[in-house]
UniProtKB/Swiss-Prot annotation:
All residue ranges annotated as the Zn-dependent PLC domain in the record: 52-289
Organism listed in the record: Listeria monocytogenes serovar 1/2a (strain ATCC BAA-679 / EGD-e)
Cofactor: Zn(2+)
Gene transcribed to yield this protein: plcB
Protein name listed in UniProt: Phospholipase C
Subcellular location as annotated: Secreted
EC identifiers of the protein: 3.1.4.3
Proregion positions: 26-51
Binding site for Zn(2+) 3: 106, 120, 169, 173
Keywords of this entry: Hydrolase, Metal-binding, Secreted, Signal, Virulence, Zinc, Zymogen
Entry GO MF terms: phosphatidylcholine phospholipase C activity; sphingomyelin phosphodiesterase activity; zinc ion binding
Reaction catalysis annotation: a 1,2-diacyl-sn-glycero-3-phosphocholine + H2O = phosphocholine + a 1,2-diacyl-sn-glycerol + H(+); 1,2-dihexadecanoyl-sn-glycero-3-phosphocholine + H2O = 1,2-dihexadecanoyl-sn-glycerol + phosphocholine + H(+); 1-hexadecanoyl-2-(9Z-octadecenoyl)-sn-glycero-3-phosphocholine + H2O = 1-hexadecanoyl-2-(9Z-octadecenoyl)-sn-glycerol + phosphocholine + H(+); 1,2-di-(9Z-octadecenoyl)-sn-glycero-3-phosphocholine + H2O = 1,2-di-(9Z-octadecenoyl)-sn-glycerol + phosphocholine + H(+)
Length: 289
């Protein structure tokens, strides 16, 4: 079956898998589409451009993941010590491979799960994606992070940095509150996920890395803990972005939801840059062990 502009996870033009299951909405945790909407009803609510994804490998205007990576680089460029200088040089040298990994995560199998994007979501409280039993962003991001470290140690630098790009994609996915609470493109109200991410693309330039920003680190030597903590921080902001007021505003077609979400979104973008900077330093540390 084909739906235009929407799949279960993200907002792309692609085939979707239709799962023969019934899922009840639960307002206290994961939110799902309460009453299945007809394809034309969903389509009418969706914007006619791709959402917060990786729509071009190196165009930050339409690639929020890569934009966050470039902001993280700016943060790392301050207070450069020997290890950080080496990391910065390598990130610059292998920028193309990193960018391609970030991009492919949204456009190639097995990374985008045949257009369902199941592995791009992760609820840290339930330790699952939006369909329990499938690989989530914590598991998938950790897998490519660890493969990247192994490839680097073996001198396979092109694949190491490509897989680092994949890991960056999953890590930054769950720094978005909707992804950290399994609120998908067809969660109620259908299309709000996509509209919100498109809105982020229009305002993110207001929240670039500044001199006072530092790399934020989590106190763990396990990358799964890093992904968990990153999602936990994002989920804490979920009620500020998805609530009764913002849903109603979106459904009636006014822009009040944008005004209500701009402040928490800006704070979320800044935090995402800083935790990603820490994530990159953590990766560098692991490659040198």
């Amino acid at each position: 079956m084909k739906f235009k502009k929407v799949v279960l996870g993200m907002c792309l033009i692609a085939s979707v898998l239709v799962f023969p299951v019934t899922i009840k909405a639960n307002a206290c945790c994961d939110e799902y589409l309460q009453t299945p909407a007809a394809p034309h009803d969903i389509d009418s609510k969706l914007p006619h451009k791709l959402s917060w994804s990786a729509d071009n490998p190196t165009n930050t205007d339409v690639n929020t993941h890569y934009w966050l990576f470039k902001q993280a680089e700016k943060i790392l460029a301050k207070d450069v010590n020997h290890m950080r200088a080496n990391l910065m040089n390598e990130l610059k040298k292998f920028d193309k491979q990193i960018a391609q990994g970030i991009y492919d995560a949204d456009h190639k199998n097995p990374y985008y799960d045949t257009s369902t994007f199941l592995s791009h979501f992760y609820n840290p409280d339930r330790d699952n994606t939006y369909l329990p039993g499938f690989a989530n962003a914590k598991i998938t991001g950790a897998k490519y992070f660890n493969q990247s470290v192994t490839d680097y140690r073996e001198g396979k630098f092109d694949t190491a940095f490509y897989k680092l790009g994949l890991a960056i994609h999953y890590y930054t996915d769950i720094s978005q509150p909707m992804h950290a609470n399994n609120f998908t493109a067809i969660s109620y109200p259908p299309g709000y996920h996509c509209a919100y991410e498109n809105y982020v693309d229009t305002i993110k330039h207001n929240y670039q890395a500044t001199e006072d920003m530092v790399a934020k680190r989590f106190c763990s030597d396990d990358v799964k803990d890093w992904l968990y903590e990153n999602a936990k921080r994002a989920k804490a902001d979920y009620p500020k972005i998805v609530n009764a007021k913002t849903k109603k505003s979106y459904l009636v077609g006014n822009s009040e939801w944008k005004k209500d979400t701009v402040e928490p979104t800006g704070a979320r973008l800044r935090d995402s840059q800083q935790t990603l900077a820490g994530f990159l330093e953590f990766w560098s540390k692991k490659t040198n062990e």
